[in-house]
Structures are given as structure tokens and as C-alpha cells.
């Protein structure tokens, strides 16, 4: 159960990683500023973003994929996701839990439960 929570936390951090990378690129482009001390962090975050996107794409095509994509990648709240997908909010939360379980099972079967945080 603890590893499942870690997986969900990794998914939740997608937007944080993406914002960090975007802010670094913005600063470089518009202010001609690039923090060289943050290069390693940027590389780590890009790797984590790729891991998250790969995990979510494992579920494609399915309602679980659509929900995870909208929620974690696009940053849309579950209530709005349920509206977009013509689901009740309760069904969307159930679908979210089901998607988390499928991802956790996939990660365990592939043996890729190494530390990603």
C-alpha cells in the first residue's frame, strides 16, 4: 500500500516538474538567464516526466487513460474531468482509483518499483 501511495504522489508531482522546466526555459528565453546549478534538477525532472507519461500511456486507450491524462497531465480537477467525460463525479473517483490500481499492478509486474522520487 505504501508503494501505491508513492506512485500516486509521483503522478501528482507531474505539474510541479513541468512548471519547473517551463520556468527555466522561460527565464532563459526572455531574461537570458539560465541557472546552471539547476541543470541536474531539470534533467531529473524531465526523466520523471517521461516516466509518468509512459506509465499513463500504458492504459491507452481507455477511460482510465483519459481521466489520468486530463487530471495529471492537463491539471484538470476530477469534477471537471467527470463533466468532460460525461461521468458522475463519484464514477470518476472510482475510475481514478481503478486507474491507480492498474498502474500499480503494472509497475509491480514489470519490476520497475525503483525509487523515482
Please name every model-derived segment.
Residues 1-58, 80, 107-117:
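N-terminal interaction/assembly modules
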Residues 58-59, 86:
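Short, conserved sequence motifs enriched in acidic/basic residues, glycine, and aromatics
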Residues 59-76:
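Short amphipathic alpha helix immediately N-terminal
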Residues 74-91:
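Helix-turn-helix DNA-binding module
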Residues 92-106:
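DNA major-groove recognition helices of helix-turn-helix
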Amino acid at each position: 500500500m505504501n508503494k501505491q501511495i508513492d506512485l500516486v504522489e509521483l503522478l501528482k508531482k507531474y505539474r510541479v516538474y513541468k512548471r519547473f522546466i517551463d520556468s527555466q526555459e522561460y527565464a532563459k528565453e526572455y531574461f537570458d538567464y539560465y541557472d546552471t546549478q539547476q541543470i541536474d534538477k531539470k534533467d531529473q525532472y524531465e526523466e520523471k516526466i517521461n516516466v509518468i507519461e509512459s506509465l499513463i500511456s500504458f492504459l491507452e486507450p481507455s477511460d482510465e487513460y483519459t481521466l489520468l491524462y486530463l487530471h495529471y497531465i492537463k491539471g484538470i480537477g476530477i469534477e471537471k474531468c467527470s463533466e468532460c467525460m460525461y461521468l458522475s463525479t463519484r464514477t470518476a473517483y472510482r475510475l481514478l482509483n481503478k486507474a491507480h490500481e492498474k498502474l500499480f499492478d503494472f509497475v509491480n509486474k514489470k519490476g520497475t518499483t525503483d525509487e523515482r522520487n
